[in-house]
């Protein structure tokens, strides 16, 4: 995992992510920090291995009072020449063998920005005996 807090790096990552969608907005919702989960794509279960890392960051952030959100499209971001150049610039080893799994944005929610949890669905979990 690599975390980026400089405004320039964060803004570059945001623009790359928006470009994947064909837009120019801020898919990172103004969050000041982005942690990118990267995995070794030569390992057959690399995506499955990397996804819990993003999920754990989401849970850890909430536990210390931060807000966090998983932002998809990391795979597409780092398949580009720009993505590969960034990894090399940042000194990430074996950049050519890495695949993006997810972007975890971190920050503090705006006042009133946190929604109440959705009501739990009844009979959603089925216990098989």
Residues covered by each model-derived region:
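Acidic, surface-exposed loops and disordered segments
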Residues: 1-129
């Amino acid at each position: 995992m690599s975390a980026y807090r400089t405004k320039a790096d964060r803004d570059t990552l945001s623009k790359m992510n928006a470009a994947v969608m064909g837009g120019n907005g801020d898919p990172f919702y103004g969050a000041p920090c982005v942690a990118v989960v990267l995995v070794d794509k030569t390992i057959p279960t690399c995506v499955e291995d990397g996804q819990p890392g993003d999920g754990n960051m989401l849970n850890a952030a909430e536990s210390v009072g931060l807000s966090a959100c998983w932002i998809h499209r990391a795979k597409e971001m780092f398949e580009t020449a720009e993505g590969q150049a960034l990894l090399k610039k940042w000194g990430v080893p074996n950049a050519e063998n890495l695949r993006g799994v997810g972007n975890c944005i971190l920050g503090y929610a705006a006042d009133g920005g946190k929604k109440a949890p959705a009501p739990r669905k009844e009979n959603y979990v089925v216990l098989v005996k």
